């Protein structure tokens, strides 16, 4: 379980916000599902800040799958945003050079 979470560890906002939870939670707890399984008030409050992940079923398999899917989609969103900004910047600079030459 721990190995699977580590292999998906990417430096995204989701991973960073949930890394603090893993430090304070029990040994070997899944990152996003720690508060729902243990049932302590502080962790449930912290999980509700994360978002829809807090409403997981609480099973080990489900929360681990949501963790890896969460990090993957956030990582892909960041990549798509960067490529889109790069594309828009390139298009604008190309248009500016083209109209300046005329």
From Swiss-Prot:
Membrane topology of the entry: Single-pass membrane protein
Protein name as it appears in the record: Uncharacterized protein UL15A
Chain intervals for the UniProt region annotation (Disordered): 1-71
Alphabetically ordered keywords of this record: Glycoprotein, Host membrane, Membrane, Transmembrane, Transmembrane helix
Bias type Polar residues, positions: 56-71
TM region(s), chain numbering: 80-97
Recorded family membership: Belongs to the HHV-5 UL15A protein family.
Cytoplasmic membrane side: 98-102
Gene Ontology CC terms: host cell membrane; membrane
Species: Human cytomegalovirus (strain AD169)
Extracellular compartment segments: 1-79
């Amino acid at each position: 379980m721990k190995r699977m979470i580590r292999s998906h560890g990417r430096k995204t906002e989701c991973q960073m916000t949930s890394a603090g939870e893993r430090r304070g939670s029990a040994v070997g707890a899944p990152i996003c599902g720690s508060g729902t399984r243990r049932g302590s008030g502080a962790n449930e409050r912290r999980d509700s800040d994360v978002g829809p992940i807090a409403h997981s079923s609480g099973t080990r398999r489900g929360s681990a799958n949501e963790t890896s899917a969460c990090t993957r989609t956030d990582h892909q969103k960041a990549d798509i945003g960067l490529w889109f900004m790069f594309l828009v910047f390139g298009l604008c600079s190309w248009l500016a050079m083209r109209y300046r030459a005329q």
